[in-house]
Amino acid sequence: MNLTEDYMVFEDVAIHFSQEEWGILNDVQRHLHSDVMLENFALLSSVGCWHGAKDEEAPSKQCVSVGVSQVTTLKPALSTQKAQPCETCSSLLKDILHLAEHDGTHPKRTAKLYLHQKEHLREKLTRSDEGRPSFVNDSVHLAKRNLTCMQGGKDFTGDSDLQQQALHSGWKPHRDTHGVEAFQSGQNNYSCTQCGKDFCHQHTLFEHQKIHTEERPYECSECGKLFRYNSDLIKHQRNHTGERPYKCSECGKAFSLKYNVVQHQKIHTGERPYECSECGKAFLRKSHLLQHQRIHTRPRPYVCSECGKAFLTQAHLVGHQKIHTGERPYGCNECGKYFMYSSALIRHQKVHTGERPFYCCECGKFFMDSCTLIIHQRVHTGEKPYECNECGKFFRYRSTLIRHQKVHTGEKPYECSECGKFFMDTSTLIIHQRVHTGEKPYECNKCGKFFRYCFTLNRHQRVHSGERPYECSECGKFFVDSCTLKSHQRVHTGERPFECSICGKSFRCRSTLDTHQRIHTGERPYECSECGKFFRHNSNHIRHRRNHFGERSFECTECGRVFSQNSHLIRHQKVHTRERTYKCSKCGKFFMDSSTLISHERVHTGEKPYECSECGKVFRYNSSLIKHRRIHTGERPYQCSECGRVFNQNSHLIQHQKVHTR
């Protein structure tokens, strides 16, 4: 190899900082930088890679002493001007840098031997009674490539890798308090008198001692908060400035701390580096692992006498027992509502004050508390940190995981005292009980309408705003909520995941299955307060009540026809627009709505799902079954206004009325 063409210069290993970056470093980091620069230069000189020209300034005047171009304020602190003797030829050099350059003139001193000798030199500083270590063939005039250490008996060459050097006296790569790796002796020279901890550098000891003295010299000019290190102050100030210099290369999300972006990127890579030694479960963050390990390690001595559930603390047990006793000691002075926990009351009171101080920087939404904001942000990041150990499914919320796990166990410990139904969790039980109590705690601030469920209110409010944020990727239709979109998408996929355990019929929606099962059970939960008639569906109940009050509020703007239900008006308007979006896959016919398409498909399948309980006859359509049952009941609901004659079908009445008009 031609050394004149391939040798390394000091600039190849020099570490430079800009003026701005140098200002950010604290004293410890600056001194450490100087140590590393001096050692790098000494290494280069020792292997003959530094070729300083006469008119070229020494590194001490360029960048070693400070590390920033045109900044030399720390030069005197490095003590590089003291005369130094050469251990090989006893020459006296001006300073340590000239000594390092001079050492390069001794060709036998390879980089490995230099490091090895440096180790013994450090040992000599701590063991004054020992003699100076010597090397075989340690002569200026001998240029052998193989050099042997008398103290360790180890051979060295100039061609092997520096990083593979293993020193017998205890040298090891060491990472100091600020994370810069350097070679350090196994013995530390500076000890803390408070805790006995050892350090290799005096300035590192000084920084450590701030922990004991509680010295915090760095103050935030915005809020006055004090910090031990300048780097901590810089991180804190980003809270005031909103600066987020660390950006995720996958999704573009920005973070104020590098640690946060590293943790966030594990979501994209799927990395879960923290594994539980007990059960093998892996986690994204160490805090999640520590929290999980309490399941294995911490005892649960407090057992509920009602259900046998065990808790870590008595406070948790007392809070849990309120579920069984129904105790709600915390009352809202605005609306009189009571809560089991004070935290629930505090959260509820923000409903009255309208306070939402926590802001999502992704979508601009405001939230009542930081926990809700953090949980909401998982919608944007896609993070699902909770995993089911039975099926491996991941969940965004811990409560959803707990609820899901009961699917595997079949556990339904919460019973409704009114109807005897069992539920998986208390929240579902409380929501169900509103059916019996009639409670509707959620009010629309636009029209004053009350709702039983929060999600129903949110859905209703989109009627006022016109918002339909959920779009179908197949047909481009927009929907007010994700559930409706998912149900709609099953029209395209043909998926029917909800199956009736009685007759095996499958449905697209869970609510449709629940309604269908009332055919088998005979349940009719909706009663008309006017005539006492019961109905299987709430929609039929509402439509029936309009007959009592003559209410017809939905008018067609094309022909003036009035309808009692908005859905009927929408269906009717398709007569004018001739819109038929639903196509039969068998014969290619188009229909105005999905229900008509489903009814039509029975022509091809031969399905007749509606059976008469009296005679067992089956029908394709529910309307046909209703007409047929009037034969058994004798019901004739259609009366002629002219002669008073009654009929069991509307078509028969219309046919009869022609007699009077002739």
Curated annotation (Swiss-Prot):
Major site of localization recorded for this protein: nucleus
Annotated localization: Nucleus
The keyword Transcription regulation belongs to this UniProt entry's keyword annotation: yes
Cellular component aspect of the GO annotation: nucleus
Biological processes, Gene Ontology terms: regulation of transcription by RNA polymerase II
Residue spans, zinc finger C2H2-type: 190-212, 218-240, 246-268, 274-296, 302-324, 358-380, 386-408, 414-436, 442-464, 470-492, 498-520, 526-548, 554-576, 582-604, 610-632, 638-660
Domain of life of the native organism: Eukaryota
Domain KRAB: residue ranges: 8-101
Keywords: DNA-binding, Metal-binding, Nucleus, Repeat, Transcription, Transcription regulation, Zinc, Zinc-finger
Gene Ontology MF, one: RNA polymerase II cis-regulatory region sequence-specific DNA binding
SMART domains hit by this protein: KRAB, ZnF_C2H2
Pfam families: KRAB, zf-C2H2
Function recorded in the entry: May be involved in transcriptional regulation.
Protein family according to the UniProt entry: Belongs to the krueppel C2H2-type zinc-finger protein family.
Protein's UniProt name: Zinc finger protein 17
Organism placement in taxonomy: Eukaryota, Metazoa, Chordata, Craniata, Vertebrata
Encoding gene (name): ZNF17
